[in-house]
């Protein structure tokens, strides 16, 4: 039978064209753009992940870009995994071999391959997390004779991290000291130098080193930088507004700036939103995204303003709040999904009343609609605000999880066993060695440890080598009992190293048995110790699963030629080190309400969101009230919190909130006043108080019942302070006033409490007495 030409079906869209289906005009432009740097200004909920993944897929399908030529950088492992899976769904399994990872994971891969270029480092280096760094800094501080109470490990760690984020090395920090430098700057510079020396001696890098050392390698060895520029012709960076200076320089080095070396710059695409820049306290600088068009003059900028997450009422509230920030790029989120429900507002008597309202609303939603517990999130400005919420949720029988609490890999028992594994992988890891030397107890006390440490310092060997010497009787001042215990410790590790080829789960089991760690917990009658056993069993399961996943991945295709195979143990330890808060947020279906800070909530979305604590001094935070830069960041935080909600948003504040054990009268947050009132359905507003209204007692605020303890005669007189005044605080002790701002009930001072630090307090609500 003949077929006429007119009967033939027209060709359908190509696979590349199909990638553009369902995108709005701005999203399509972002996907297909080529030839110059691209800045995608992606408003909250505007589909940036879809754009990024479609752009990557389009590079492969339409432009013939190889998988190995693409580098995509995210801020969490969870986001990286989601991006990879989405691209695999669009173009197939080949996308699994694309480099999609966090900044830190990307740098680890580069450094594992280039470790030989860094003096004193080899490819199986340990990665010290915040706790490891603080432990090492405590050792360094004590050895240098510093007052650990005045210069705490946390204070030193933050200061050194800030220097590293600015790519300032120890020599530059020392050289930068002047006659005007304060004691803290001098202490930090001296500690920084010794801290780095000990890190290198332990064959270890901390988080900030991962970025800084990679930048140093790329800048010191042009041929290495050229290699990666040739390889990664397309670099995509998500959440660019959250980058710090070191990350900014890293991206610049990977992309290249000119063709002087014969390699044209790579094609750079960054996605971000200055309105969601909320991590200045971690070193992030909003300038990176605000100045992108100046740094890359031929940039194409595309704004994504159509929102696919929230209702228009929620978006209008967010738009109104963020519009008050000066100097921002004009952008207004909109949706075609309709106005939706009004925002629900509630003014509570105190934090307990606020928590009760939240719990009652959650209970009503879960009982009377399609909303389930895992659809609900409760946000607050600071971690300590969760206490009253947790108490009420427990009484109400509402299941919940606090995100950002003690994470699985931060629990003591997990850290102990991971420390054993790290020593097996890197015998020079002094911090891990000293953590487990007498854990569980095996008769190696502080004095014996100190003798070994002195021997290591005097002979110029590592702590691990000094332990071997101690086992051989070469360390002075050690008694026979300690020598025997150390010899047993060294022998135990020799035996365990013979099992490094075992399945990872079996190796963890062997560590638990051979060290006696499990036996000690099993012998305990403390219920908490039994919970620790459960956690260790979970660690064994995680290790087994990791081994299986790694074997399956290896069977699918060849290993990356740019990354040396450091073994399953090193890979596992790397993953443990780089896990983040956002990677442990419960998945949908967990059946629990999620509690978290506003900072942790960034990047997430929930059908129902409660944002609590809308009070000046709480949100915005007290320290931001007199600082325009910090106040702008607090406003961006409000914008982030509001735009997490998909269907329903609740905002609440308390008239009185406890602070330092005292009731504090809290003015309404200025951010709450910036939301158009027609968008809010106030379930309860602030009643006008009677003259003798209780502010902290059992009665409802505004009740006519007199309060004998708060009568006019017994009220605390208004505290008036001036610069230079000496005061005493119930918690911080003696202090001197440095700055004063505000008047009357709103007056506050910045007070230097010496070793307790500088604290900003409200005169009338803090337990402060003028001397």
Swiss-Prot record:
Annotated region (Disordered), positions in chain:
1-21, 691-716
Q: Where is the UvrD-like helicase C-terminal domain?
A: 312-603
Q: What class of enzyme is it?
A: isomerase
The record's GO molecular-function terms, alphabetically, read: 3'-5' DNA helicase activity; ATP binding; ATP hydrolysis activity; ATP-dependent activity, acting on DNA; dATP binding; DNA binding; magnesium ion binding
Knockout consequences: Forms small colonies, liquid growth is unchanged. Increased sensitivity to UV light, mitomycin C, nitrosative and oxidative stress; a double uvrA/uvrD1 mutant is even more sensitive. Single uvrD1 mutant is strongly attenuated in late stages of mouse infection, the double uvrA/uvrD1 mutant is strongly attenuated at all stages of infection.
List where this protein forms a coiled coil.
Answer: none
Listed under catalytic activity are: Couples ATP hydrolysis with the unwinding of duplex DNA by translocating in the 3'-5' direction; ATP + H2O = ADP + phosphate + H(+)
Activity regulation remarks: Inhibited by EDTA.
Q: List the disulfide bonds.
A: none
Question: Has keyword Chloroplast?
Answer: no
Description of pH dependence: Optimum pH is 7.5.
Give UniProt keywords alphabetically.
Acetylation, ATP-binding, DNA damage, DNA repair, DNA-binding, Helicase, Hydrolase, Isomerase, Nucleotide-binding
**Under what conditions is it induced?**
Up-regulated during mouse infection.
> Per its UniProt entry, which superkingdom is the organism in?
Bacteria
- Binding site residues for ATP: 45-50, 309
Query: What is an annotated GO biological process for this record, any one?
Result: double-strand break repair
Q: What are the temperature characteristics of this protein's activity?
A: Optimum temperature is 37 degrees Celsius.
Protein purpose: DNA-dependent ATPase, acting on dsDNA with a 3'-ssDNA tail, unwinding with 3'-to 5'-polarity. A minimal tail of 18 nt is required for activity. Also highly efficient on nicked DNA. Involved in the post-incision events of nucleotide excision repair, as well as in nitrosative and oxidative stress response and possibly in persistence in the host. Inhibits RecA-mediated DNA strand exchange; this does not require ATPase activity. When combined with UvrA greatly inhibits RecA-mediated DNA strand exchange.
The record's note on quaternary structure and interaction partners says: Monomer. Interacts with RecA.
Could you identify this protein by its name?
ATP-dependent DNA helicase UvrD1
């Amino acid at each position: 039978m003949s077929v006429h030409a007119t009967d033939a079906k027209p060709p359908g869209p190509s696979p590349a064209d199909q990638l553009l289906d369902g995108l709005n005009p701005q999203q399509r432009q972002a996907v297909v753009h080529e030839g110059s740097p691209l800045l995608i200004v992606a408003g909250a909920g505007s589909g940036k992940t879809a754009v990024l993944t479609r752009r990557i897929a389009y590079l492969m399908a339409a432009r013939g870009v190889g998988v190995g030529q693409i580098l995509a950088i995210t801020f969490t492992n969870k986001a990286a995994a989601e991006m990879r899976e989405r691209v695999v769904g669009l173009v197939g399994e080949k996308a699994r071999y694309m480099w999609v990872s966090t900044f830190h994971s990307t740098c680890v891969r580069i450094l594992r391959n280039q470790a030989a270029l860094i003096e004193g480092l080899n490819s199986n280096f340990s990665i010290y997390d915040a706790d490891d760094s603080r432990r090492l800094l405590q050792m360094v501080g004590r050895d240098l004779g510093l007052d650990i109470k005045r210069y705490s490990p946390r204070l030193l760690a933050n200061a050194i991290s800030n220097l590293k984020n600015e790519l300032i090395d120890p020599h530059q920090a020392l050289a930068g000291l002047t006659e005007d430098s304060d004691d803290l700057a001098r202490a930090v510079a001296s500690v920084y130098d010794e801290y780095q020396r000990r890190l290198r001696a332990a064959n270890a890098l901390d988080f900030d080193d991962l970025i800084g050392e990679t930048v140093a390698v790329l800048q010191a060895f042009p041929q290495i930088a050229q290699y990666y520029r040739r390889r990664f012709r397309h670099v995509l960076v998500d959440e660019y507004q959250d980058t710090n200076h070191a990350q900014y320089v890293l991206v610049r080095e990977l992309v290249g700036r000119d063709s002087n070396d014969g390699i044209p710059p790579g094609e750079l695409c960054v996605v971000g939103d200055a309105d969601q820049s909320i991590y200045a306290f971690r070193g992030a600088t909003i300038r990176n995204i605000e100045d992108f068009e100046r740094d890359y003059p031929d940039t194409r900028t595309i704004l994504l303003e159509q929102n696919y997450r929230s209702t228009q009422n929620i978006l209008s509230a967010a738009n109104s709040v963020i519009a008050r920030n000066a100097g921002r790029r004009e952008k207004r989120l909109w949706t075609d999904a309709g106005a939706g429900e009004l925002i629900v507002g509630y003014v509570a008597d105190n934090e307990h009343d606020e928590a009760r309202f939240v719990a009652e609303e959650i209970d009503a939603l879960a009982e009377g609609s399609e909303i389930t517990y895992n659809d609900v999130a409760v946000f607050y400005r600071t971690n300590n605000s969760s206490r009253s919420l947790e108490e009420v949720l427990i009484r109400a029988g509402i299941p919940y999880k606090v995100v950002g609490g003690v994470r699985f890999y931060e629990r003591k028992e997990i850290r102990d066993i991971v420390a054993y594994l790290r020593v097996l992988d890197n015998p020079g890891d002094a911090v891990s060695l000293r953590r487990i030397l007498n854990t569980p107890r095996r008769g190696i006390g502080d004095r014996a440890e100190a003798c070994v440490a002195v021997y290591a310092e005097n002979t110029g060997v590592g702590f691990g080598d000094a332990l071997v010497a101690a086992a051989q009787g070469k360390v002075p001042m050690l008694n026979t009992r300690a020598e025997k215990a150390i010899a047993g410790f060294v022998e135990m590790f020799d035996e365990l190293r013979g099992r490094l080829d075992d399945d990872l789960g079996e190796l963890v089991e062997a560590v638990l048995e051979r060290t006696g760690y499990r036996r000690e917990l099993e012998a305990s009658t403390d219920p908490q110790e039994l919970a620790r056993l459960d956690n260790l069993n979970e660690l064994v399961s995680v290790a087994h699963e990791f081994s299986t996943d790694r074997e399956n991945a290896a069977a699918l295709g060849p290993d990356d030629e740019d990354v040396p195979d450091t073994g399953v143990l090193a890979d596992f330890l790397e993953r443990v080190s780089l896990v983040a808060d956002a990677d442990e947020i419960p998945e949908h279906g967990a059946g629990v309400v999620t509690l978290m800070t506003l900072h942790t909530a960034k990047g997430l979305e929930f059908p129902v969101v409660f944002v609590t604590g809308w009070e000046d001094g709480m949100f915005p935070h007290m320290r931001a009230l007199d600082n325009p830069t910090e106040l702008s960041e607090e406003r961006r935080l409000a914008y982030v919190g509001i735009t997490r909600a998909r269907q329903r948003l609740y905002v609440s504040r308390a008239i009185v909130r406890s602070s330092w054990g005292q009731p504090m009268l809290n003015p309404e947050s200025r951010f709450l006043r910036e939301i158009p009132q027609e968008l809010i359905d106030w379930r309860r507003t602030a009643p006008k108080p009677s003259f003798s209204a209780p502010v902290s007692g059992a009665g409802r605020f505004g009740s006519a019942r007199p309060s004998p303890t708060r009568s006019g005669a017994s009220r605390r007189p208004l505290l008036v302070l001036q610069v230079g005044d000496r005061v005493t605080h119930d918690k911080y002790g003696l202090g001197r006033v440095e700055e004063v701002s505000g008047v009357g009930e709103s007056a506050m001072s910045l007070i230097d409490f010496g070793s307790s630090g500088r604290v900003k307090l409200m005169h009338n609500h803090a337990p402060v007495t003028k001397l």
